[in-house]
């Protein structure tokens, strides 16, 4: 059993039907004052369907879900916009994108920015490329490569949902960040030591991060218990 905002209780016997993701997503976004155009909601729901479909073929996300994909993965990704506004012409890198998270949901609601999704696993990138094509997204591309291969490219923002330690993500991201760029991570658990280590190692990475912010999101929904948005700044 899990809870949605406003303490709506859902059990396995009352799990959302396929026609309900629109209402669930719209309700959650309204709770957070996140205004989405109807066509954005349509694409986000369609992405959720595609993600589940591809996940049955290859391992993109856990197959033992305790909450609908539209909440646990897609809405979770959208919460980044509570702490960062994507600007026109902004270049964004999704580091270790897996099944397109958080990059594809963010690209859907921020068409003014351009997104590059990278992952070292070819079959995951193939899935992302197929989903991007199906969704007809023109501001996002997916490439099969390791982050070390992105020589000479710079980004205003790097986002990541992968489980690597913050210190490691900062080491990967620093050479790719614009001089006023930031790294935004979706993380969970106790992060005090992880953040401390990244700050202590900053001199190895040209002073990055100069500071780190931690934003708990457990008040949004119990589904996100112990989940945080972590932002590392130049």
From Swiss-Prot:
Taxonomy, superkingdom: Bacteria
Enzyme class, first EC level, given as a word: transferase
Matches recorded under Pfam families: GidB
Molecular functions (GO terms): rRNA (guanine-N7-)-methyltransferase activity
GO CC terms: cytosol
Keyword Membrane: no
Keyword annotations from UniProtKB, A to Z: Cytoplasm, Methyltransferase, rRNA processing, S-adenosyl-L-methionine, Transferase
Residues annotated to bind S-adenosyl-L-methionine: 96, 101, 119-121, 147-148, 161
Principal place of residence: cytoplasm
Keyword Cytoplasm (UniProt): yes
Compartmental location: Cytoplasm
EC number: 2.1.1.-
Similarity field: Belongs to the methyltransferase superfamily. RNA methyltransferase RsmG family.
Role this protein plays: Specifically methylates the N7 position of a guanine in 16S rRNA.
HAMAP family xrefs: 16SrRNA_methyltr_G
Name this protein carries in UniProt: Ribosomal RNA small subunit methyltransferase G
Lineage: Bacteria, Pseudomonadati, Chlorobiota, Chlorobiia, Chlorobiales
Gene that encodes the chain: rsmG
């Amino acid at each position: 059993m899990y809870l949605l905002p406003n303490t709506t209780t859902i059990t396995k016997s009352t799990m959302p039907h396929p026609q309900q993701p629109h209402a669930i997503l719209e309700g959650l976004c309204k709770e957070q004052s996140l205004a989405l155009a109807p066509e954005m909601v349509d694409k986000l729901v369609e992405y959720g369907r595609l993600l589940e479909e591809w996940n049955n073929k290859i391992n993109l996300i856990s197959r033992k879900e305790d909450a609908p994909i539209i909440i646990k993965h897609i809405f979770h990704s959208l919460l980044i916009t509570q702490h960062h506004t994507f600007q026109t012409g902004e270049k964004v890198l999704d580091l270790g994108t897996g099944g397109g998270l958080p990059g594809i949901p963010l690209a859907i609601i921020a068409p003014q920015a351009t997104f590059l999704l990278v992952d070292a696993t070819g079959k995951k990138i193939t899935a992302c490329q197929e989903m991007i094509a199906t969704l007809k997204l023109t501001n996002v591309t997916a490439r099969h490569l390791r982050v070390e291969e992105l020589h000479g490219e710079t980004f205003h923002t790097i986002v990541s949902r992968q489980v690597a330690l913050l210190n490691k993500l900062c080491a990967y991201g620093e050479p790719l960040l614009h001089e006023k760029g930031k790294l935004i991570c979706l993380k969970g658990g106790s992060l005090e030591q992880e953040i401390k280590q990244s700050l202590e190692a900053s001199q190895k990475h040209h002073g990055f991060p100069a500071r780190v912010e931690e934003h708990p999101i457990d008040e949004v929904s119990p589904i996100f218990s112990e989940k945080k948005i972590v932002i590392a700044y130049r």
